[in-house]
Amino acid sequence: VLSLFPGIGLLDMAFEQEGFCVVRGPDLLWGGDIKTFHPPAGKFDGVIGGPPCQRFSRLANLVRHVYGEEKVAADLIPEYVRCVSEAAPRWFLMEEVPEAPPPIVEGYVVRERLIRDVWVGGHTSRLRRFSFGTRDGRALAVEELVLHCPNPLPAVLASGGRWVPVAIGGGGSAKKTRRPNGAERSGYIMGAKTQRYFREAVSAQGLPESFDLPGMTVAAKIHAIGNGVPIAMGRAVAKAVRESLNHA
C-alpha cells in the first residue's frame, strides 16, 4: 500500500497493525513534495492518504479573516487524484473532513462513509469522511460499537489552540468530558504548547504512552499529531478495507 501525505504515519500505523505493508510517499514534513512525485504504475495494491483539509474546514474562515486568503492551505486533493491515476491500484482510500469534495478518479467507483472516532472505540469526537474507490464499486462496511462514550474528548487540534466542545449534540457550552483514563475534564481546554498537552494528545489519539517525535519542538509535535488519524479510527477503516477486498 502506498501512503500519500503520510505526515507522522498514524494512518499508516493503523493499516500496518491490521496486516498491510505500507510504503510512505513524500511529505512536506520531511522535506518531500507531492507535486514532483510520480508513483510507478501497477506496483501497489492500494493507495491511502489524507490531503491537507484546512481549505474545507471551518478553520479556513478564521485563517482568511486573520491572515488573508494567501495563508489558507492549498487544495491538494487533485494531487492525490493524480497519484492514484498514475499508480493504478486495485483500490484507494482518501480521508478528509466531511465538507471536502470527493475524489473523482477515472475508472473507479467511490463509496463514502462518515466515521466518528468514538463510534469505533476511540476517545475523541473527531468526524471524518472516508472515500473508498474500487473498480467494481465495493462498499466499506465499518463495524461500529453498539455502546460508546456519550461524552468523548474534543478532537485533537493541529493548531495547538483551544480545544472546543465538538461532542455529538454540543451546543457551544462547556461540558464535562473524560480523559482516556476516566478522569473528568472540562469541555474547554486551553491548548498551551507544553509537553503535558502533547502527552494528552498522544493518549487521545490512541497512541502508546512511550510515543514521541524526537528532534521536533513541542509545538511541532502537537501540530503533527493533531493532523493524524486516531488509531482506533484508522484500524476500523483498515479492517473494513481488508474485509471488503476479501469478500468475493
PLM features: residue spans?
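C-terminal target-recognition/interaction regions appended to catalytic cores
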Residues: 148-248
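Conserved acidic E/D residue at the C-terminus of a beta-strand in Rossmann-like folds
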Residues: 5, 24-29, 95-96
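Adenosine-cofactor binding site in Rossmann-like domains, unifying the SAM/SAH pocket
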Residues: 16-40, 114, 206, 212
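Glycine-rich SAM-binding Motif I of class I
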Residues: 8-9, 13, 232
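A generic secondary-structure signal
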Residues: 14, 82-86, 240
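Class I S-adenosyl-L-methionine
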Residues: 12, 16, 36-46, 53-194, ...
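Class I SAM-dependent methyltransferase "Motif I" SAM/SAH-binding loop
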Residues: 3-8, 225
